[in-house]
Structure formats: C-alpha cells, structure tokens
Amino acid sequence: MAYLEVRGVEKSYTTSAGATCVLGGIDLALDEGEFVAVVGYSGSGKTTLVSLIGGLIPPDAGSIVLDGAPVSEPGPERGMVFQQYSLLPWLSVYDNVALAVDAVNPGLSGAERRRVTEEFIALVNLSEATWKRPRELSGGMRQRVAVARGLAMRPKLLLMDEPFSALDALTRATLQDELLRIWGERRSTVIMVTNDVDEAILLADRIYPMTPGPGAVLGPAIEVGLERPRHRRHMSLTPAYQKARQGIVEFLRACRRGWA
C-alpha cells in the first residue's frame, strides 16, 4: 500500500444555479518522502483536492488513506501552507511557529519548546526576525513563517496550495530555492498544487496535470528525470526538463481544446 492513497474521490458543490461537479474521480498515490506536484489552470479544482486530502471538506465519493489511516477530518499529521499567509497578526514569528509546536507536543518543557521553535525558524532563515510581527515582514518572509509553521508540526504529509503565487517573481524564485533546500534536508512527503509548470518541474519528483473541469481528473503522471540537487540556471537546458515541460504543456493545451 502506498503511503498516501486517494481513490475515486469526487466532489460537487450546490449553488442556487444547481450542482457543479468539481472533481470527477481522482486517483493518486504517493510513497513516503516523495514530492508530487499537481498542475492545472486556475479554477480547475486544485484547491478542492488539497482541502479534501487535508480533511477540511468531505468527499462525496471515494476514499483517502494516509499511512494506513482514513482521512475524515483535519489532523496534525497533515500540515498545510496556503496562498494567503494565514498568520495571527498580533503574534510574533516565534509565537506563530510555537503554536504549531504546542499543537503536536503539548507536554514539552519550556526549554525544549524554545529549542524546537527556534530550530524551525532558523530552517527558513528567519532567526533575525524572531520577535517581529507579521506587519513588519515582507510577503516572502510571511510565507517563510507559514512554511516553518507547517513543518513544525512534523506532519506525515505537507500540503501546499499555490504557496508562492501571490509573491513577486524574484521573491518567488528565492522561496522555491529555499523549499528545495529544506526538502533536501527533511525529505518530507509533499503535495504542491500550482499553475506554474516550471515551478513544478523544479521542485517535484512527479507531476500530475489536471484537466480544467468541470469534473476534473488527473492526467497521466509525468516523471521529472532531473537529478537532485537541482539548479534552475542549468535546468532548462537539459533534455529531461524539456521532455517534462512538453508533456505537461501539450496535455493541458489539448484539454483546453477538448482533445484530451
């Protein structure tokens, strides 16, 4: 059995205009330590998929199993990083991260709590901003806090919902490189959804393109045959990059034209 198994998951929403099928039967499997990306157009259902795996909403059909346990509600074994920073504005960087530490380690001594909290703040290179509040931070720094908070729960699975899409291009590239470094050190199991093909190729081991919907499904898996550690400067010149990018782009364009 895979570490994460998503089988036949469907989800519809009902509005005054009637029912809309968002996901029409999602199948997905991850091994422990894998970094998988789901790529699709805006509005295709990527956030709905993350919310289902995170236990924030229930599926209409199908099952989600993580490490042998069914997913039916939110839990500390699944960390989440959203597009919006979702930080508590009245708390410092330290206190925002410490909340996550407390959630999974309520019995820690004060010294151990401080050590663990500072460890994850240092992991995202924010030690100098430890006592600053979110309003004193740039957008990129706020998102680093969100990543630190997600990792501080030591989750079995980290879910990332377009975490860098609200950032400017330079900050986005910096945080992508930071995430590469952190993943290389921690080897966490990660699912990231994004509409940026190059971001997915840079970060992921395997990529699933998603059809536009309604009734979105995942297309065939595309393996990213790039060695790690990866360097964006040379990546675009490699045959593996060009093959992966061509496969994703052609699938998504064909879906838009109604050919897939």
Predicted regions and their residues:
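Conserved ABC ATPase "signature" region
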Residues: 105, 109-129, 181
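Conserved ABC transporter NBD signature motif
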Residues: 62-74
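Catalytic Walker B motif of ABC-type/P-loop ATPase nucleotide-binding domains
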Residues: 158-161
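Conserved signature/switch motifs of ABC ATPase nucleotide-binding domains
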Residues: 132-135, 153
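Short coil-to-helix segment of the ABC ATPase nucleotide-binding domain corresponding to the Q-loop/switch region
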Residues: 91-100
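Helix-to-loop junction immediately C-terminal to a conserved catalytic motif
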Residues: 54
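The feature captures the beta-strand-to-loop junction immediately N-terminal to the Walker
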Residues: 39-41
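Hydrophobic anchor residue at the start of the ABC signature
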Residues: 147
